[in-house]
Amino acid sequence: MVLFSEDHIQETRRRGRIEVICGSMFSGKTEELIRRMKRAKFARQRVEIFKPAIDTRYSEGDVVSHDSNSISSTPIDSSASILLFTSEIDVVGIDEAQFFDSGLIDVCNQLANNGVRVIIAGLDMDFKGVPFGPMPALCAIADEVSKVHAICVKCGQLASFSHRTVKNDKQVLLGETAQYEPLCRECYQRALQEDREKS
């Protein structure tokens, strides 16, 4: 005789959620996004990854980490475009979220409310130490926030700040290793003071 057991009920309803991976430059944000997306693909989930079209540093069509790990992606100009590609998708990945418009917040909420797992990676602060683009609001609505850290190039402590090493005041300057360095709070404050003295 087989008894009905709730333990054997298989969950078939999709549960949406928002996961944010944030931190400074060179902290492994994109690396972690790629890892989570590849795990989802391995589990035969339908995935789609998006990045801002302006990010062509390593590849026009792929999301690429500073360590050269990559995964195929769709470059887009506007966050609203994400909804055009996600009707049959289980997991959505979004890299460099700080470069998207504020509409990304509603897009992510809409996807999660419709059962999609949304994984977002982005800088939480710009080179001035100011919260960057839609990232603060995305952290607020997220079900899970992972703050990742680089290592301070000056003292070896955990680094939360991205110091720009070239003179340029534009908020958006797509950076590679020569243009930014990760610093801890103390070394970052010292570097800002040195920058002011040079000006």
Curated annotation (Swiss-Prot):
Residue runs in coiled coils: none
One GO molecular-function entry: zinc ion binding
Gene3D superfamilies named among the record's database cross-references: 3.30.60.20, P-loop containing nucleotide triphosphate hydrolases
Biological processes annotated in GO: DNA biosynthetic process; thymidine metabolic process
InterPro entries in UniProt: P-loop_NTPase (IPR027417), Thymidine_kinase (IPR001267)
Catalytic activity: thymidine + ATP = dTMP + ADP + H(+)
UniProt entry tagged with the keyword S-adenosyl-L-methionine: no
Positions annotated to bind ATP: 23-30, 95-98
Domain of life according to the entry: Bacteria
UniProt cross-references to Pfam families, sorted A to Z: TK
Keywords of the record: ATP-binding, Cytoplasm, DNA synthesis, Kinase, Metal-binding, Nucleotide-binding, Transferase, Zinc
Active site positions: 96
GO cellular component: cytosol
Family: Belongs to the thymidine kinase family.
UniProt protein name: Thymidine kinase
Gene: tdk
